[in-house]
C-alpha cells in the first residue's frame, strides 16, 4: 500500500482531459465598442464574415461592413467632415427685406446695385431646400422690374418731401402764384400790425397824460351830452348852456380851476336863478369823474353864495 499512488487521472474519465488543457490557455478577449455590441444582436450573419477553421468560439468582424445610423452620425460630427458637410448642406435662400421709408437717401441706389450684383453672382450655387422654403430667382426679370419700380417710387417721394419743405428750390410752374399770395398775406399782416401799433400809441399817450396830471372837464358845451336838467322859466338860458361844448384841461390846482370856470359860465350866460345854478352843477358833475364830485359841490356852494351876495349888494 505504501508504493501505490493515487492519481486524479484514474478517478476522472478520459473525456475531460482536453477540457482541462483548454482551461489552462488564456482566452483572447477582443474589446469592442459599446455601439457595436448593440448592433451585433440585431445584425444578421453576412456571407462576407467567415469563421476561421482553427477556432470554433472566436468570431472576427470585417471592417468593410455597412455603417449603422449611429456610426454615420459620429462620422458626420467629426471635425474633418463637419465643416464640409455643413457648408454643402447650408440653405442659400434669399428673401427680399421689406423697404423701410426712413432709409431713403441718394446713396440708396448704389448700395442696392452692389447687393444685387453680389446676389446674382451667388445665385449660381446649388440650393438644398424643403417644400416649405420660399425660393426666389434673382435672375428673373419680373423681380428686377418690381424692385426698380419700388426704388423709383421712393426717389419720387423723397423729391416731393424736399419740395414741400423748401419752396425756394422748387421748379414748379405754379410757384409764382404762391409767391404772390404770400406777398399779399404779408402786406395784410403789415397793415394790421401798423393799425395795432397806432391804436396802442393812442391809448398809451392818453394813459401817460392822465397819469402825469388829472384831467378835468371844466365847461359843458356839447349838445351830445345827455343832461337831465330841470326845466326853468327862462328856456333861452338853458339852451345856451346845453349848446355849449366841454373843454378838457389838465390842472395842478383843481379847486381854483373849477372856481374860475364856474364864474366865467355864470357871467357869460347871465345865470341868476336857482334852477339855472342847479343845471350848471349837474353839467359839472356829469362831465367829471366821481373823484371830483365833493370838490365840485364845495366850490359851487362858495360861488353861489358869492353870486347871491353880489345880487343883494347891487340892489
Curated annotation (Swiss-Prot):
Give the knockout phenotype.
Answer: Moderate irregular xylem, but normal plant morphology.
Keywords for the protein's UniProt record, in alphabetical order: Nucleus, Repressor, Transcription, Transcription regulation
Q: What biological-process GO terms show up in the record?
A: negative regulation of DNA-templated transcription; regulation of secondary cell wall biogenesis
Pfam families registered for this protein in UniProt: DNA_binding_2 (PF13724), Ovate (PF04844)
Q: Which locations, inside or outside the cell, does it occupy?
A: Nucleus
Query: Polar residues bias: where?
Result: 201-212
For whether the record's keyword set contains Ribosomal protein, the answer is no
Note the PROSITE patterns from the entry. OVATE
Its predominant location is: nucleus
Q: Name one GO molecular function term.
A: DNA binding
Enumerate the residue ranges of region (Disordered).
27-54, 159-238
| InterPro entries in the cross-refs | DNA_bnd_dom_ovate, Ovate, Ovate_C
**Expression sites by tissue:** Expressed in root vascular cylinder, root tips, xylem of stems, flower buds and siliques.
The segment(s) forming the OVATE domain are 247-306
**Bias type Basic and acidic residues, positions:** 159-172
GO cellular component annotations of the record:
nucleus
Purpose of the protein: Transcriptional repressor that regulates multiple aspects of plant growth and development through the regulation of BEL1-LIKE (BLH) and KNOX TALE (KNAT) homeodomain transcription factors. Forms a transcription repression complex with KNAT7 which regulates secondary cell wall formation.
Q: Which NCBIfam families match?
A: A_thal_3678
Assembly description: Interacts with BLH1, BLH2, BLH3, BLH6, BLH10, KNAT1, KNAT3, KNAT4, KNAT5, KNAT6 and KNAT7.
The entry's other comment says: Plants over-expressing OFP4 show kidney-shaped cotyledons, round and curled leaves, small rosette size, late flowering, reduced fertilization and round seeds.
Task: Name it.
Answer: Transcription repressor OFP4
